UniProtKB/Swiss-Prot annotation:
Protein name as it appears in the record: DNA-directed RNA polymerase subunit beta'
Major subcellular site: plastid
Chemical reaction(s) catalysed: RNA(n) + a ribonucleoside 5'-triphosphate = RNA(n+1) + diphosphate
Superkingdom, natural source: Eukaryota
Cofactor names: Mg(2+); Zn(2+)
Example GO molecular function: DNA-directed RNA polymerase activity
Assembly description: In plastids the minimal PEP RNA polymerase catalytic core is composed of four subunits: alpha, beta, beta', and beta''. When a (nuclear-encoded) sigma factor is associated with the core the holoenzyme is formed, which can initiate transcription.
InterPro entries in the cross-refs: DNA-dir_RpoC_beta_prime (IPR045867), RNA_pol_asu (IPR000722), RNA_pol_N (IPR006592), RNA_pol_Rpb1_1 (IPR007080), RNA_pol_Rpb1_3_sf (IPR042102), RNA_pol_Rpb1_clamp_domain (IPR044893), RNApol_RpoC1 (IPR034678)
Coiled-coil ranges per UniProt: none
Subcellular locations according to the entry: Plastid, Chloroplast
Cofactor note: Binds 1 Mg(2+) ion per subunit.
Any Pfam family the entry gives: RNA_pol_Rpb1_2
Functional note: DNA-dependent RNA polymerase catalyzes the transcription of DNA into RNA using the four ribonucleoside triphosphates as substrates.
Length: 685
């Protein structure tokens, strides 16, 4: 699909019936709308031509041969003549046969069918959204129980039951069909009783996502208060924790539906899309035998059962209601097998006891459509190596080993050597590269400075699995990566490998610079949450950097750790050695960092740093812990985390804060980042 900015993109998610019709429907010159597959046939056994309205129908999917209709008439594709685009006899469009790779059809289901991915996969999205046990929903979907759901009509209901599930009275399942006549039971069933996937669809259609979000949040807060108080019963406390975890998942699911603007009722199918014929082919092999994709057989199974249900509903006045519900169950099972064979237990097999490959089997795993066909090809100008952390790199940079860089950029390097008259021809340039002369590395750095590279970590599950970086030459044999980009790749530094690709064309380089650079992909494309966040190594480093060594004036007057910047006196008290420290005073952060570089203080050693006058400190009502007077009349008011130096006239001369070198370094990094952002923002404006 193409968005409003003309960017090609792939979006996977529930689709509305209107969108499925828009994908498949075509209007013939006579006004007939085609696109629905109604027959379970593929090719005629005598003519070997696709059956009309079947799974390989040329009217729906396009011609088998370019420009030739089913009648055999030929017309030049793209001719400027005002000839009709469709054949008047067979209704086949005169287009290229490649249309059969993307032109879809659809099956209009006689009854709604739940999408098995959203019902049976764990966690079950439908069960979480409706707050119902999965076992009860399965009984409802597969017509094992009834549901007294909200009636379709707005008139008073027969039993005065609205918007609630009933599973307790199992005898109704047998008593109601026997009590009513067929016609009366049909009227009662359509008005009062909802069963199958239709009941799920009604419940999902009536669900307000914002109300679900608010109610779940209120319940989560109430359970949090109960958990703090405690019930005294371990079993009840465990139930509360499980319920809280469930509510968190339910709120996250509701947020995802709201952000992506997807209606929950789309998880129940009314129209079943039919894949293009070229993606589920029938091939003729030696001996005249045919080999068909398993998906064709599964589609035929769905159409057979769906047509049977349509006939039963057309004559429902003479058909028992239980027979109709049994056929609805068969349709639901056929749709489940098509989407994910074996997800409900025993998979469906053919006559040779071989399991059918469903749609899920075709696209998932290493041998699936995405990973094997689209993402699993080996290409030139690519390499692979282990990734390690690069703490000195910027967010948009990556460290590229020399051995990999000199191979990937060899073509550009040869061009640079010849252009700068270092080599007269390609042979001499290659010999200089093999000898690895110093001039080679200088030109290589110039080439890499203007050429981005692409890093990819398999499996590429979303677009952040491939990002662009500015390469930097490193001496190591591993690729150095900034730790902030690891979450987008779902990577860590325990032996993961990444592939390196070089974009060659100007269009690819422009796309890498404008769209794929790592500093331009800070938010998740799915839900909009920040994805470049500190994790693992960075969190541990920040913790060690800012933990300090017993910060606070009381804990630091006598410290068991060594202090290098002052004269220390060792005191023996109760067989423990204490060191009486002289406080370290620094006029600025530069003085503090200089003292650290000279190894006069440690990274976590507490010190007093002169700070700007802060009205919050001046107006504070905190009582000083200690007051120290000097011989000239000045005195120090020492508080827990700051110190005020006053003159004889009690005026504030300086304010010192209690901090460490780690805090100072962290603060300066944040300050420089904010200033750089403000400068860049003002430059853009």
């Amino acid at each position: 699909m193409i968005d409003q900015y003309k960017h090609q993109q792939l979006r996977i998610g529930p689709v509305s019936p209107q969108q499925i019709r828009a994908w498949a429907n075509k209007i013939l010159p006579n006004g007939e709308i085609i696109g629905e597959v109604t027959k379970p046939y593929t090719f005629h056994y005598k003519t070997n031509k696709p059956e009309k309205d079947g799974l390989f129908c040329e009217r729906i999917s396009g011609p088998i041969k370019s420009g030739i209709c089913a009648c055999g008439n030929y017309r030049v594709i793209g001719a400027e003549k005002e000839d009709p685009k469709f054949c008047e006899q067979c209704g086949v469009e005169f287009v290229d046969s490649r249309i059969r790779r993307y032109q879809m059809g659809y099956i209009k289901l006689a009854c709604p069918a739940t999408h098995v991915w959203y019902l049976k996969r764990l966690p079950s999205y439908i069960a979480n959204l409706l707050d119902k046990p999965l076992k009860e929903l399965e009984g409802l979907v597969y017509c094992d129980v009834f549901s007294f759901a909200r009636p379709i009509s707005k008139k008073p209901t027969f039993l005065r039951l609205r918007g609630s599930f009933e599973y307790e009275i199992q005898s109704w399942k047998y008593s109601i069909p026997l009590f009513f006549t067929n016609q009366s039971f049909e009227t009662f069933r359509n008005r009062e009783i909802s069963t199958g996937a239709g009941a799920i669809r009604e419940q999902l259609a009536d669900s307000d996502l914002q109300i679900i979000l608010n109610n779940s949040l209120v319940e989560w807060k109430e359970l949090g208060d109960e958990e703090v108080i405690g019930t005294g019963n371990e079993w009840e406390d465990r139930k509360i924790r499980r319920r809280k975890d469930f509510l968190v998942k339910r709120m996250e699911l509701a947020k995802h539906f709201i952000r992506t603007n997807v209606e929950p009722k789309r998880m129940v199918l009314c129209l079943l899309p039919v894949l293009p014929p070229e993606l589920r082919p029938i091939i003729q092999i030696d001996g005249g035998k045919l080999m068909s994709s398993d998906i064709n057989e599964l589609y035929r199974r769905v159409i057979y059962r769906n047509n049977t249900l349509t006939d039963l509903l057309a004559t429902s006045r003479s058909m028992p209601g239980e027979l109709v519900m049994c056929q609805e169950k068969l349709v639901q099972e056929a749709v489940d097998t098509l989407l994910d064979n074996g997800i409900r237990g025993q998979p469906m097999k053919d006559g040779h006891n071989k399991v059918y490959k469903s749609f899920s089997d075709v696209i998932e795993g290493k041998e699936g459509r995405f990973r094997e066909t689209l993402l699993g090809k080996r290409v030139d100008y690519s390499g692979r190596s282990v990734i390690v952390v690069g703490p000195s790199l910027s967010l948009h940079q990556c460290g590229l080993p020399r051995e990999i860089a000199i191979e990937l950029f060899q073509t550009f390097l040869i061009h640079g050597l010849i252009k700068q008259h270092v080599a007269s021809n390609i042979g001499i340039a290659k010999s200089k590269i093999r000898e690895k002369e110093p001039i080679v590395w200088e030109i290589l750095q110039e080439v890499m400075r203007g050429h981005p590279i692409l890093l990819n970590r398999a499996p590429t599950l979303h677009r952040l699995g491939i990002q662009a970086f500015q390469p930097i030459l490193v001496e190591e044999r591993a690729i150095c990566l900034h730790p902030l980009v690891c979450r987008g790749f779902n990577a860590d530094f325990d032996g993961d490998q990444m592939a390196v690709h070089v974009p060659l064309s100007l269009e690819a380089q422009a796309e890498a610079r404008l769209l794929m650079f790592s500093h331009m992909n800070l938010l998740s494309p799915a839900i909009g949450d920040p994805i470049s966040v500190p994790t693992q190594d960075m969190l541990i480093g920040l913790y060690v950097l800012t933990i300090g060594n017993r910060r606070g004036i009381c804990a630091n007057r006598y410290n068991t750790y060594n202090c290098r910047n002052s004269q220390n006196k060792i005191l023996n008290n109760n067989k423990y050695n204490y060191i009486k420290m002289k406080a370290t005073y620094c006029c600025s952060s530069y003085d503090a960092l200089g003292a650290y570089r000279q190894k006069r203080i440690d990274l976590d050693s507490p010190l007093w740093l002169r700070w700007r006058l802060d009205q919050r400190v001046i107006g504070s009502r905190e009582v000083p812990i200690e007051i120290q007077y000097e011989s000239l009349g000045t005195y120090h008011e020492i508080y827990r985390h700051y110190l005020i130096v006053r003159s004889v006239k009690k005026k504030i001369r300086w304010i010192y804060i209690r901090t460490t070198i780690g805090h100072i370094s962290f603060y300066r990094e944040i300050e420089e980042a904010v200033q750089g952002f403000c400068w860049a923002y003002s430059y853009v404006i």
